[in-house]
């Protein structure tokens, strides 16, 4: 046998040994199987930057945790006159395995939960309701935000100035709860407060002009659309009225830069969206079966600090 033949024989034997070892240890190279969860995020919030940031956080988590996610906002279906119950049922009929739900009405939320099969886990975002279907509650610390607003108003307030809380009469339970807290906390800080509910946002014109002409007034609103409407009046009419509030949108950012809005509390919607989807997918895959309540904080934003690095992740998470 020549040297060349011996080399070929050795290579053949080596190949046979390697194949035997692979088969005996069941070491077969395959494409990794990935379980994809079919989930829905269904919300009832204005089409502002909070909605966009929440959606972006949810999308990022869906990619990271292999979820096929549908993001639905009730406001997109106003022309079709579709209600929240119908949206949820549509997703269930389409094979949805889990839901992240945000609803402006506690009563409606409870009705929806009653009709969701027990085997479908639900993560509530900024919504209060009790049900065995609810596996996690994700919200923001309302009391902390109310204290922050009272603190900022008190710091800037001149002696004798009072506060007017302004919102639309049909706003969500959550927003009304915020104003309930503020109505309680301002007097504790020695600040007189009154409450005004608008039947239509167009009424902001007369309200702002009246308060500005009267003098001695500061305005706080946790209704972003009311805040935007009042800031627009200040800009168009050239009136000066200290405006404070809660919310985040392109218009609020613009009015902060123009100093028609003094400051706002902005919640970490991106973080809330990411955690909600992360939690839901881990429940579905069996990695996390613990019920959990998570509260996200807010940051104080003014025209001067909104582009600080410490606030970028909350205000502009996908910039």
Q: What role is predicted for each listed range?
A:
Residues 123, 130, 224-225, 235-264, ...:
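Venus flytrap/periplasmic-binding-protein-like
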Residues 25-54, 71, 136, 162-171:
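Short beta-strand segments enriched in small/hydrophobic residues
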Residues 9, 271, 275-319:
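Hinge/cleft segment of the Venus flytrap/periplasmic-binding protein
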Residues 92-103, 121-125, 164-167, 193-194, ...:
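Periplasmic-binding protein-like
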Residues 137-163, 248-252, 268-285:
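Hydrophobic alpha-helical segments within soluble ligand-binding/sensing domains
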Residues 107-144, 249-257:
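Flexible loop/hinge segments that line or gate small-molecule binding clefts
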């Amino acid at each position: 046998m020549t040297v060349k033949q011996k080399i070929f024989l050795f290579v053949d034997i080596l190949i046979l040994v390697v194949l035997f070892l692979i088969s005996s240890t069941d070491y077969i190279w395959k494409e990794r199987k990935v379980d994809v969860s079919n989930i829905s995020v269904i919300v009832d919030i204005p089409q502002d930057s909070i909605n966009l940031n929440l959606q972006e956080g949810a999308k990022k988590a869906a990619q990271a945790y292999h979820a096929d996610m549908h993001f639905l906002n009730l406001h997109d279906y106003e022309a079709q006159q579709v209600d929240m119950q119908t949206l949820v049922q549509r997703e269930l009929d389409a094979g949805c395995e889990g839901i992240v739900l945000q609803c402006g009405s506690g009563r409606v939320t409870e009705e929806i939960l009653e009709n969701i099969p027990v085997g479908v886990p639900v993560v509530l975002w900024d919504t209060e309701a009790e049900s065995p279907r609810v596996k996690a509650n994700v919200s923001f610390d309302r009391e902390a935000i109310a204290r922050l607003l009272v603190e900022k108003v008190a710091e800037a307030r001149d002696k004798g100035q009072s506060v007017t809380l302004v919102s639309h009469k049909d706003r969500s339970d959550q927003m009304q709860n915020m104003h309930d807290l503020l109505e309680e906390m301002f007097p504790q800080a020695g600040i007189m407060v009154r409450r005004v509910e608008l039947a239509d946002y167009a009424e902001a014109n007369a309200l702002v002009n009246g308060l500005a002409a009267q003098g001695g007034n500061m305005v706080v609103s946790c209704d972003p659309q009311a805040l935007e409407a009042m800031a627009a009046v200040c800009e168009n009419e050239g009136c000066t009225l200290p405006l404070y509030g809660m919310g985040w949108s392109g218009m609020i950012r613009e009015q902060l830069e123009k100093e028609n809005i003094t400051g706002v509390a902005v919640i970490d919607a991106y973080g809330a969206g990411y955690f909600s989807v992360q939690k839901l997918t881990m429940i579905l895959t069996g990695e996390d079966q613990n019920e959990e309540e998570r509260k996200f904080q807010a940051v104080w934003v003014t025209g001067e600090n909104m582009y600080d690095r410490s606030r970028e992740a909350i205000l502009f998470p996908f910039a």
